[in-house]
Amino acid sequence: MRIYLRVVLPLSLALNSYGVLAFFWGERGVCAMRLLEREKKELVHHIQTLAERGRDLAAVVDALSFDEETIGAYARQLGYVRAGDVLVRPVNFTVAHMHTLDSGDARPLVAPACFSDTRCKVYALCVGFFVVLLQLLWGSARAYFKT
């Protein structure tokens, strides 16, 4: 019975510690899932921002394609003049809002910070070896004080 406990106790504690580590801090654990959910929310927000920028750029493209006033203002800013026009540079007049629109930025993906499965197994083995070591020390101390 004593040998049975010396084997079962470290083994069960090692397996339980592996289960707890993998469940909470493993690659598919609770911590990793929370990080992935937060990343998903950020990506959805980023996609919505890019969709808004896309609508703004589509409006600018439509204005530059079909609106004569916008085409004329943009052409004048580039230095073109219609035949018969006098070249006058208006003060405080820019079409700078067309130049401030960009197509968006790339968002780097970050890997979730969690333990790999191998690391969880190594920690569980360390727990098992630590329990075996404690059993050996406790048994030798008990034998020492018994005499």
From Swiss-Prot:
GO terms for cellular component: plasma membrane. Keywords: Cell membrane, Membrane, Transmembrane, Transmembrane helix. The chain crosses the membrane at residues 4-26, 123-145. It comes from the Bacteria. The keyword Protein transport does not apply. InterPro entries: FtsL/DivIC (IPR007060). Its main location: membrane. It is found in: Cell membrane. It holds the Pfam family DivIC. It is a multi-pass membrane protein. The keyword DNA damage does not apply. This is Uncharacterized protein TP_0181.
